[in-house]
Amino acid sequence: MRLNFLFLCCWLSMASYAQTNFEHAIEYRQKLGFLAAHRGVMAHMPKNPAWAGELSYVLRSRGHKAYHRAYNYPTFGGTLFYGQVGNQEILGNYLGVYGYTELPMISFRNYRMDFKFGLGLGYNNHPYDPIKNPLNVAIATRINGLMCLAIKSTYQYKKNAFNIGLDITHFSNAAWKVPNFGINMPFVSVGYARTIVPVDKMKFDPFEGEARAPMNITYKQWYYSVTAILSGKQMMPIGGRRYPVYALNFSAKHFFGHKAGLELALDLISKQAIMDYQPYIVKSQLDILQAGAYAAYLVPLDRFHFVFGMGAYLRDKFSPEDPLYHRIGARYYLKNGLLLNLTLKTHWARADYLEYGIGYTFNYRTR
């Protein structure tokens, strides 16, 4: 959840900087979908269609940074979400706010198709309660993380923009408190946006080189980092204790250009919850140490990078979960080489824990 809060803070700071460098618009989207029962224990929960409305403040980039042109002018924004997730009696209503980025996959004249990735916070009024609401096995906390992944098609005519989209919206507390099977809702949406502050795309002389705010990384070289990670998670059964998680990540990163990078990494993880897994077996700290090899696709937006990765355990003596793990989230790189890491570690659709980390890139140099 802190990952999503910090993502919002980054977006708000960017919005204050965007008075002259971005085109501004207001957008409303209406969404209709269903609650996906991705675990058998959730089969009783979907009862009605899920619906939601989203009101967004939109910032359309106009080229003042080099990566804007590389991505064909991405869009940023902040969204207010309100909806019913498919079972009013058990799950109640959800309110959320999130920041997002839309990266064009196709852009031709007045038409564009975007990939959208958003992170934020959500609130629900019917969390799990052992007496009042024991059937809600999806969410045990009122405040949760919110994630939205979407494909969106937009046609713009002058100051008006019409869009349709497919997305999946997710609520979870990342196993901070159980039960936490999470809420997953596939949606289809239609929307309308109106430009309120028009700004033309910046024009560049091809002989003058890059835009006036170049990327803060160089390409065709490897960057080497180490990151220390701290987290916590609660284990089943319900009402159990919360355990700390300690980890180190050693990584090498290579960027192929403004739009893509590769990360190869080694993870060392000390998940204290394993001490109580199969409690009849005596364990040491060395016994519970997990090691994993990991690869990720990086999406660099200047110093802010999205991370989408997958790994496999090389050492996992007790195998309390699946042999494969996944990581999705974001990092921010400071000018002095320090990096801030906020990612969600999962085993497929099941959250493991949030990774709060701080690291250092040894050969980082700004241009």
What are these regions (language model features)?
Residues 38-43, 89-92, 127-133, 174-181, ...:
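Outer-membrane beta-barrel translocator domains and adjoining extracellular loop/strand segments
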Residues 30-36, 59-61, 80-86, 119-127, ...:
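Transmembrane beta-strands of outer-membrane beta-barrel pores
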Residues 22, 47-53, 72, 91-97, ...:
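Residues that define the transmembrane beta-barrel architecture of outer-membrane proteins
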Residues 24-28, 74-76, 113-119, 162-166, ...:
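Transmembrane beta-strands of outer-membrane beta-barrel proteins
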Residues 55, 184-205, 351-367:
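Outer-membrane beta-barrel "beta-signal"
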